[in-house]
Amino acid sequence: MGRGSFEIIKQIVDSILSTIYGIEEKCIICEEYEENDYICEKCKKSINIINIESSIIHEDEELKSYSLGFYGYELKKLILKLKYNKSFLAGKILASYMSEFILKNLKDKVDILTFIPSSKSALKNRGFNQCEVLCKYISKSCKIPYKELLYKASDSIDQIGLDNIKRWENIKDSFMVKNKKYIEGKRVLIIDDVITSGATAFYAAKAIKEINSDEVFILTVAKSRV
């Protein structure tokens, strides 16, 4: 059994114990006691969903990009809880906002979902890919199929801390495509957690476009202000 499966089972067990023994629930963000929901009303109102639409233009190509909001405050806290604290509840909450955006804006424009793959080292350390977690929840909510279409051909340096020029150089030619039969003639939506320079999204989309996909978009939880 993989570490990712173990963490999911642990979340389920914790939920069952909470129900049986009446363990107090806390707001996932501020950790104050919250009787009726996983997010208190104060934190819920502070989640700033503004639906950012932008274009990533590079090498004379354009990629349409969507993000729920900017990377900071409550959105950032939820992303970090999913990514580093292994809170699948945080992932489910974020995915619900992403699903709402898709149903309102992209439902008739998307045939299949996929996600940005983790490097082998990140997957080994974390035990799961947070983008895949989001993608699974979104697929179920929106009733859009998802498939693992990308993998990293080699482990690049972590993008965190690199300037924009080095980000583009570091990630170029990193992505390879699999399950090609699910791509040809399809409109593909790639799911990611945070977009910064756009280099990762651009080269992931470019790899898919080369397999005769009809169109490729990217949807992220947040967009960095950098």
Each predicted region: which residue ranges?
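Glycine-rich phosphate/pyrophosphate-handling loop used in enzymes and phosphotransfer proteins
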Residues: 1-192, 196-226
